[in-house]
Swiss-Prot record:
Binds 1 Fe(2+) ion per subunit. Residues 180-283 form the Fe2OG dioxygenase domain. This is Mugineic-acid 3-dioxygenase. It comes from the Eukaryota. Involved in the biosynthesis of mugineic acid family of phytosiderophores. May be involved in boron tolerance.
Length: 338
């Protein structure tokens, strides 16, 4: 265990070769962008249209006055930093290299990328619904279970409100996203990106689309989120007390491609650590997801296969990270064995 912990980015004195990525795969972001700031306290019609506009343009939305108080956000940042500031020996009891194990600390990202690792340590927690029971979470720091549990409940509430607004804007019944489609356990990734000795050769997370329904990101104050846009990459500048929400692959399937899950990645920097918290709104594994009839017509036939979420996850795990959603679940894909 000590040997493994010493190889995590937090404790490494130099970059292990497995964390160094080929330079030709690290196209730098060229533009600093502030995503449109959507004030959720404004009129409902205005907010709904702004969410649709930003979601269609970027696949991401940024919201303020979202209902989670500034003190709650500060408590969340504080307890997450407190966890990663603990001595290595205290964190070691929560560390696991077993990808099937939940409520664990791991390093290098959970993506299958042919042995490549990424400059990140992650505390991954499962928030069960409807109980919200956090007894299986780390018992240190003392306030972690209470603070992260309270925040996660609120973050899920923000996601459900945005999904209701999308229903209104897309002509879906108001409860379309209530039930199994959003009823899996919330997966909470508390991401710690240490300063990198070589940001030009490391990434915190590789380019990817989230395979959930929707992700709520507490972005932190240090830039690092980059999103694919018009053939390049743009840097997203953090806005105080905001949340950044992006559409997952399941939402793309439901809308038959009308809303897109957009690739994004996490850049590293030399100067200071970055902390962010991603809350993934996940369907139940046995939930069957396919294009909704509202998005299918004779002129616009289904573009995606209808699969259980469990089937989708298995297919996604065996596909190379650079593959697009079309190679995974496009109904016209003729590849064998996926």
């Amino acid at each position: 265990m000590a040997k493994v912990m010493n190889l995590t980015p937090v404790h490494a004195s130099s970059i292990p070769d497995s964390f160094l990525l080929p330079a030709d795969r690290l196209h730098p972001a060229t533009t600093d962008v502030s995503l449109p700031i959507i004030d959720m306290s404004r009129g409902r019609d205005e907010v709904r249209q702004a969410i649709l506009d930003s979601g269609k343009e970027y696949g991401f939305i940024q919201v303020v006055n979202h209902g989670i108080s500034e003190p709650m956000l500060h408590e969340m940042y504080a307890v997450c930093h407190e966890f990663f500031d603990m001595p290595a020996e205290d964190k070691a009891e929560f560390f696991s290299e077993d990808r099937s194990e939940r409520n664990k600390l791991f390093c290098g990202s959970a993506f299958e990328t042919l042995g490549e690792k990424y400059w990140i340590d992650v505390l991954e927690l499962l928030y069960p619904l409807p109980s919200g029971d956090t007894k299986d979470w780390p018992h240190k720091p003392q306030m972690l279970r209470e603070v992260v549990g309270n925040y996660t409940s609120l973050a899920r509430g923000v996601a459900m409100e945005i999904l209701r607004l999308l229903c209104e804007g897309l002509g879906l019944r108001p409860d379309f996203f209530v039930g199994d489609i959003s009823g899996g356990r919330v997966v909470v990734d508390i991401n710690y990106y240490p300063p990198s000795p070589n940001p030009s050769r490391t990434l915190g997370l590789p380019p990817h689309c989230d395979r959930d329904l929707m992700t709520v990101l507490l972005p932190g104050a240090v830039p690092g989120l980059e999103i694919a846009y018009k053939g390049g990459w743009i840097k997203v500048q953090p806005v105080p007390n905001s949340l950044v929400i992006n559409f997952g692959l399941q939402l793309e399937v439901v809308t038959n491609g009308y809303l897109k899950a957009v690739e994004h990645r996490a850049a590293t920097n030399f100067a200071e650590p970055r902390l962010s918290v991603a809350s993934f709104i996940v369907p139940a594994d046995d939930c069957v997801v396919g294009p909704a009839e509202e998005f299918v017509s004779e002129d616009n036939p289904p573009r995606y296969r209808t699969l259980t979420v469990g089937e989708f996850k298995r297919k996604h795990n065996v596909v190379n990270l650079d593959s697009s959603i079309n190679q995974i679940i496009n109904i016209n894909n003729n590849q064998k064995g996926i």
